[in-house]
A protein has these predicted regions:
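Structural preference for solvent-exposed beta-strand-turn elements
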Residues: 1-371
Length: 371
């Protein structure tokens, strides 16, 4: 196998594929990526951890001989990152060693035969489409609410639903819940409906892929896998098994009080006051009064902080405690000039949402903290 490829093209595709490769593996070949010729003018780069697979095709400047070889993922990426901006020559030698040459640089890497690389899941094409920007928005607005606790398996990913009304993504860690829905990409009939649990790692890698792709994404699912096609790049992920909680039961239905804030002003105030919150609980206090919100935090060792934010609130005075980090993560991605804060009292879950959202439906439910 021998080919020549531009350094930029090689580095870009390696940056995506090596992201799914675990640095420490009990199966040595999984620390490698598979590079193989794909037709007369392209190469294919694949990486997997057996749960998530990314496959990228890249145009080669020339292919002198066809073939395939597995090479260390991280090492090749580090090399490509530091090479000069010049054509890269890649050649498989005898005994499965690989030579990489670029300008005055030359590297030799140990390779592994393709036969030892896991067989990758087959891709089943699907007519379902969703714009890259919409999918990225769904991920960015929900991924932070996925649990970090390894033991809570069914909460370690996002519920991804496609039906006749569009696409929904829901995540929760038991303390908060993020719900994002758009009317784009709806299913034509029951046979194309999707209801799956997608792992956090898959969403993180998918977010990276959408950042470099502007077109429509094709997607679909079978019994065990979900597929996302982004032009010449393909992501295949094993689904999570188990039953996601009934999130509709968590959505508050009797929150009869509401306050609206400038997103930027609220975000900056929360960020500043949180500097004095307890390092473990991140607890801050919201005191709502007529046309004003007082945010405060105190730490017995370091002091206290207070800041007021203008509001349109006209109800009774109310105190509510929140985890500042939970609020900040929502405010970072809400993408609206104003946000509405809906609640019943200081002991019930609150719901935050953007005032204007271009037809999308974004809700963030947060449990209060004891003060």
């Amino acid at each position: 196998m021998q080919f020549v490829i531009g350094r930029g093209a090689l580095q870009k595709e390696l940056s995506f594929v090596q992201g799914v490769v675990e640095r420490k593996n009990t199966i040595p070949v999984l620390a490698n990526i598979l590079i193989e010729s794909a037709g007369e003018n392209a190469i294919r780069i694949s990486g997997t951890d057996l749960d998530v697979t990314i496959r990228c095709d890249a145009d080669a400047e020339s292919i002198k001989s066809q073939g395939a070889i597995c090479v260390p993922a991280r090492k090749l990426f580090d090399i490509a990152r530091l090479l000069p901006d010049a054509p890269v020559s890649f050649k498989r030698e005898e005994n499965d060693w690989v030579t990489v040459e670029c300008d005055r640089s030359k590297f030799r890497l140990p390779g592994i035969s393709k036969e030892t690389f896991p067989e990758l899941p087959g891709f089943k094409s699907t007519p379902l489409k969703l714009s890259s920007s919409s999918l990225k928005s769904l991920i960015d607005r929900t991924i932070f609410a996925i649990t970090q606790e390894e033991g809570r398996y069914t909460l370690s990913g996002a519920k991804f639903e496609l039906d006749g009304n569009g696409v929904k993504m829901v995540t929760t860690d038991g303390h908060r819940l993020a719900f994002a829905a758009i009317k784009e990409g709806s299913a034509n009939d029951a046979s194309t409906e999707i209801d799956v649990l997608i792992p956090r790692k898959t969403l993180a890698e998918l977010s990276k892929l959408t950042s470099d792709f502007d077109g429509d994404i094709g997607f679909g699912a079978d019994e065990n896998h979900v597929y996302f096609q982004l032009g010449s790049r393909l992501l295949i992920s094993r689904m999570l098994s188990g039953q996601f909680p009934n999130y509709e039961m968590v959505m508050p239905k009797n929150n009869d009080r509401a306050a609206t804030f400038e997103t930027g002003a609220l975000s900056q105030a929360v960020r500043r006051v949180a500097l004095m919150a307890d390092d473990r609980s991140h607890a801050i206090r919201f005191h709502l009064s007529k046309e004003q919100l007082l945010i405060s935090a105190q730490n017995s060792d370091e002091g206290e902080a207070r800041e007021t934010v203008e509001s349109d609130y006209t109800g009774d005075d109310t105190d509510i405690g929140f985890n500042a980090q939970y609020l900040q993560e929502f405010l970072n991605v809400v993408g609206s000039e104003k946000v509405t804060f809906e609640f019943k009292d200081g002991n019930s879950q609150a719901q935050l949402r953007p005032v204007s959202d271009n037809g999308a439906d974004y809700k963030y439910v947060v449990m209060p903290m004891r003060l």
